[in-house]
Swiss-Prot record:
Protein name: Zinc finger protein 275
Range of residues in the leader sequence: none
Residues with Phosphoserine modification: 76
The gene coding this protein: ZNF275
Superkingdom in the source lineage: Eukaryota
Cited function: May be involved in transcriptional regulation.
Annotated family: Belongs to the krueppel C2H2-type zinc-finger protein family.
Source species of the chain: Homo sapiens
Localization per record: Nucleus
Zinc finger (C2H2-type) boundaries: 101-123, 129-151, 181-203, 209-231, 237-259, 265-287, 293-315, 321-343, 349-371, 377-399, 405-427
Comp. bias regions, Basic and acidic residues: 79-89, 167-176
GO function terms (MF aspect): DNA-binding transcription factor activity, RNA polymerase II-specific; RNA polymerase II cis-regulatory region sequence-specific DNA binding; zinc ion binding
Keywords on record: DNA-binding, Metal-binding, Nucleus, Phosphoprotein, Repeat, Repressor, Transcription, Transcription regulation, Zinc, Zinc-finger
Gene Ontology biological-process entries: regulation of transcription by RNA polymerase II
Amino acid sequence: MMSHPCVSLLGVPVLNPALVPHLAQGQVLLVSDPSPNTDPAKYSESTSATRHQMKGEDAQPQEMASTSFPRASGPSPEFRQHGDSDGKRGSPQNLPIEHHFACKECGDTFRLKVLLVQHQRVHSEEKGWECGDCGKVFRGVAEFNEHRKSHVAAEPQPGPSRALENAAEKREQMEREAKPFECEECGKRFKKNAGLSQHLRVHSREKPFDCEECGRSFKVNTHLFRHQKLHTSEKPFACKACSRDFLDRQELLKHQRMHTGHLPFDCDDCGKSFRGVNGLAEHQRIHSGAKPYGCPHCGKLFRRSSELTKHRRIHTGEKPYACGQCGKAFRQSSSLLEHARIHSGERPYACGECGKAFRGPSDLIKHRRIHSGLKPYECDKCGKAFRRSSGLSRHRRIHSGARRCECSQCGRVFKRRSALQKHQPTHHE
């Protein structure tokens, strides 16, 4: 015996709604397989007739599944076969039909128990599948699944901007976890409480570590240790590439990246790379505009503590860097280094355009503006531009009328120091 494909589905607990109209046509009986002695041609002809007649015959109750199915609709007009105008269900040959399953509420009869169960939901108003998003109720699982797709399509998807915000929030959270100690003054974070305590001295200007040689004070003892090597001329860390000496290993490692070109620290805002983490931190203040270092004398603010240190020497007159050849003193070590090249004749900074060499990098930068024509210093009064800041400062005296260069012999004042220097020899003649 060979069972019809729709009959085998009746044994499972869920009814495929697509099969309901098909089952309503009565195609649920078992179809006999051809016997070995049956002529294939006669079997094909008789089988077609038998299948046609089955559309009007009832299935035996014991052959049907007694399982209650979840959802159904009311009686469908599709149950009427072959144009029965009187609404009676039957085959083309008007075979008698037995209705084994009758509704107690309205008396309608059905060939299949599953159709009766589905029909009874019309009277009981039993609810089926309820949507958890909008509360709408469906009797059929197919309608319910189709309805669910509308909510899935309507759900907003995260856009690129939200994804970037999520990434930024995740980075901030990771930074808070990695550096739990935060400065209340500027928001800078630290891994250890000792680092925060050391940083707070920047805001309080506390410098508890004093140099016994010159009296200079420092916030951190390691800075004092480095400074003391200036007095002893001790620089135990030498670069193998250029033989330059350094006070500590960190300065040497940072310097060696100049030769290797390795810049491991990148700025998230502009992508610029740096050799050290301190250089990156100072650079990021350009984007944030933070200037946490203030001068106690004039109130001027700086992004770097080193800039404040150099600036304060203007007020104190301190010049801790003295030349060993002529005794001339300087406020900055870089100025002393450039000055020492006067005695040695060294000019390591050469122009790539004309080959002219200079003692310091700042002189080379100023010289390059001759070739590029760049004049970054512009007068806010008349708009005239200059290659050097000193040229702009001299020009501004024209608008202000200030004459600061006074001759000590005769009291005559000049706009430029060079003019005063030319004038002074006249008193010796």
